[in-house]
Amino acid sequence: MELLAASRACIFFGLVTVLDAWGVQQVELSEGAWAMIDGRDVLTPTNTTTRVTKAWTFLETPPGCAGDISVKKVCVSHSLCEDNIIIGKHCNLLTGEHGIALAEFNVVNGSLRRTDDVYFVNGTVFPILAETRSVLQIHRATPSIAGVYTLHVSIDGMMKHSVVLLTVKKPPKQPQPRLRVKTPPPVTVPQVPVKTHTDFVVHGYHSRVYADGESFELSVNLESHIVEPSFSAEIQWYYMNTSSSSCDLFRVFETCIFHPTAMACLHPEQHTCSFTSPIRATKILHRVYGNCSDHGNSWPSRCHSTLLGNRLYFIQPAQNRVDLLFKDTPASATGLYVFVLLYNGHPEAWTYTLLSTANHFMNVLTDVTRPRLGEHFYTDLGHKIITPHPSVATTEELGAWTRHYLAFLLVIICTCAALLVALVVWGCILYIRSNRKPYEVLNPFETVYTSVPSNDPSDEVLVFERLASDSDDSFDSDSDEELEYPPPPKPAPQLPPYQFVDGGDAPSGRSGFKVWFRDTPEASPVPLHKPTLQGPDYSRVASKLKSILK
């Protein structure tokens, strides 16, 4: 078996010839062959590099001109100079050069990080533009893919090219010797249908709790049952960070593993609490197998493969090329690790394992339904949500969290300030209302008597008079002038002691006082304000009282 595999490898490499003539690679493949062509990245980013752009372009060879192509020091287009390819005089170049892949990178800490990319594939040629390598992956070569493939690399405006001339030829037919054999009589044998069924089974643990700095192996225990003579396969490992998730339950949707480009898988509801499409995760390991014919369980390590992907410094592929080895694992490696096996381009087996420290352990559940589409999702299909590597600080998430926190804090401060101002204003209003009193007009004079009091009920001579203004008087509170009151009347001269007219004692039932009136009545004080209506005249009544008392 090993001899057969070695002979096939020799035949394969014998059919593929790579010549480096003046910087141009000339690759010759046989029809139906599989190959991986290195694009030879011609520029290396420096410490001052800020932006890198890579692109693959294709210039198709016209039909019938495969034998009239040579490598010469001639330019055929503006993008191909210095070391170029020329087509003979008898062939007309009717097709134009068109792009098949484009990728943009940013430089972070001296290493490239992909920001956006786009690919145009036809099922046979798969251009790959990675951070460290740029290759062309050929599956079952056909004459239609023959032509000029150019890798363009632009670093801060400086452009370089790497050219590959690919030709595809039909394999030579080996003459078979004619053997004369007597044909036996036909024997009727019942035809039994041949079962061509391939099956893959994985037996892995769905969770593992580790300590910071621990080393261990993450195994999926892959079992394979392959009946096809040759096949192609891919082994992929994806990572999704769960350390910053506050979900009680993390869901893994199996439907999205088989349909990664569905809209509900690209933009699910509660995307931080679910693993849906692998496109939303970070690919940490990608191994490609082409034209493999080993049918045992050890086919991943026996068949020829190409390792792609940007794996982390603490992760190494295991000896069987399927499992992962973790060495001195940091706490930032917490997350969901998903294994996917593609057989002839279709997912056939998958499993997941939650690696976390004790502080970030959570429940993970496999969901076989379709996830719900998020209410606010991106309509731009070119946008990709990429989970950052666990070894790199997620500055974007930290910045978003800081902006949300500052906005929330600003709203709280503004609300508290508004409430404080409202309380101060309301307190001032209550204080002013409580201290405010209606204006009172005070009489500066006391009540005086204009006659001598008596205890005789029949004597109604006692008259009270308040030396004050009328009820109609009003004061202007806004006036700064003080009110001037007339001086009080001078006291009357002292009268001699009176005597009873009849010379006897005071009659019983009386107070013993007599009221003496002057001949000239005492003038009343001039009121401050004259009443509008003149009161009744009591002068006659007073004269009668005087005559009676005499």
From Swiss-Prot:
UniProt region (Acidic), positions on chain: 468-482
Any single Pfam family the record assigns to this protein: Herpes_gE
InterPro entries tied to this protein: Herpes_glycopE_Fc, Ig-like_dom_sf, Ig-like_fold
Mod. after translation: Phosphorylated on serines within the acidic cluster. Phosphorylation determines whether endocytosed viral gE traffics to the trans-Golgi network or recycles to the cell membrane.
Disulfide bonds: 247-273, 256-265, 292-303
Compositional bias annotation for Acidic residues: 471-484
Location relative to the cell: Virion membrane; Host cell membrane; Host cell junction; Host Golgi apparatus membrane
Keywords, alphabetical: Disulfide bond, Glycoprotein, Host cell junction, Host cell membrane, Host endosome, Host Golgi apparatus, Host membrane, Membrane, Signal, Transmembrane, Transmembrane helix, Viral envelope protein, Virion
UniProt-annotated stretches for the region Interaction with gI: 65-91
Gene3D superfamilies for this protein: Immunoglobulins
Virion surface compartment residues: 24-408
Glycosylation sites: 47, 109, 122, 241, 291
General function of this protein: In epithelial cells, the heterodimer gE/gI is required for the cell-to-cell spread of the virus, by sorting nascent virions to cell junctions. Once the virus reaches the cell junctions, virus particles can spread to adjacent cells extremely rapidly through interactions with cellular receptors that accumulate at these junctions. Implicated in basolateral spread in polarized cells. In neuronal cells, gE/gI is essential for the anterograde spread of the infection throughout the host nervous system.
The protein, known as: Envelope glycoprotein E
